């Protein structure tokens, strides 16, 4: 319930638009496209590395493990550990299924279609991050 409520609040406020703009800019950057409004606007508003995917993997792990284990600190720690490993680990077979759920969740609850002003902010933020990376020799 809490995730749905939080998602609706995010989706119905400018936060959802900025979140989508961030994803769209990251997708353009990941594809080595020039960061222009036109290029960014054509990108999907879901991203593979969004924290929503981590939350979905943790919730799914908790749902399964709570059927086997009783509520305890161990259950929560194990849930977080497995959820994180699914998010960042290899192989990605199980993750691909979770990713579908995560992307749908991102699209329906945690992002909304951004306007150009949201895209401009995200593009400028990415450009500044890129400048800092170059300045630090990365």
Region roles according to the model:
Residues 1-19, 76-93:
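Hydrophobic alpha-helical membrane-embedded segments
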Residues 5-53, 98-138:
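Polar-ligand-bearing catalytic/cofactor-coordination segments
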Residues 58-84:
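Juxtamembrane "helix exit" motif at the C-terminal ends of alpha-helical transmembrane segments
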Residues 68-71, 89-100, 108-112:
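Membrane interface segments of multi-pass transport proteins and intramembrane proteases
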């Amino acid at each position: 319930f809490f995730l749905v409520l939080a998602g609706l609040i995010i989706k119905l406020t400018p936060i959802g638009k900025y979140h989508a703009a961030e994803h769209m800019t990251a997708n353009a950057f990941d594809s080595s496209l020039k960061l222009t409004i036109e290029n960014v606007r054509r990108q999907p508003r879901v991203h593979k590395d969004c924290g929503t995917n981590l939350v979905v993997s943790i919730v799914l792990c908790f749902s399964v493990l709570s059927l086997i284990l009783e509520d305890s600190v161990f259950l929560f720690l194990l849930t977080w550990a497995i959820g994180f490993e699914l998010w960042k680990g290899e192989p990605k077979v199980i993750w691909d299924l979770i990713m579908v759920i995560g992307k749908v969740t991102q699209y329906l609850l945690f992002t909304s279609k951004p306007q150009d002003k949201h895209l401009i902010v995200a593009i400028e933020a990415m450009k500044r991050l890129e400048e800092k990376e170059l300045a630090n020799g990365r």
